[in-house]
Amino acid sequence: ISVAEHAVMLICAVFKRLGIAEQRFRAGVMIDGATPELTTQESYAYNWVGLERFEGLYGQTIGLVGLGKIGSEVATRLRAFECDVAYTKRNRLSEDEEQTLGVRYLPFDELLASSHCVSLHNRFDEATGIMMGAREFGLMRPRSFFVNTARGRLVDEEALVAALESEHLAGAGLDVFQYEPLQTDSPLLHTPNTILTPHSAGIPIGVSLAWELGQAGKKISNALSG
């Protein structure tokens, strides 16, 4: 659940351009000669750092690559934002399962081309290798977003940086990387339209174990009480 929450947080953050907003805010950017004035309910300085584009999640198509336990939890949470949630995976869900989760299936390439944000939720193994490279980023909708809370080695980081620098992608939210900790000379650190977190999406093992034991205790109690 914690990873799903983190993924949704990053999805919200990239749509709202929180990374760029904070950078400009801390740098003291004020457009159109704005000066600080006491605010009231009706008088305030709207978007004084001059964000060119920021949006909400309502009505956006979010494409989930992989729909296991975490991907399903992400889909459930995105329903609260009234998103159009599409998914792709090797074995398609049944129609009933899709209706329960509120998702629709798309082939991989079609999902990339039609989503406003693509969120990666596949497992990594050596056989899988890179799932998101130059071809895949090139297929993505212009000015869309990319989020990865799965594994860093699923992504060609050079291709991602190129897609961000060319502004084909509007932004990315990343919690995982090819090398961890992230190398200090990584271009991702100097790409302004990224939000980076230090592989912290999952809750600590002790907290997770306590939660799982609590859930197990509830199930046992429910079973005993009939």
What are these regions (language model features)?
Residues 90-187:
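Rossmann-like adenosine-cofactor binding region
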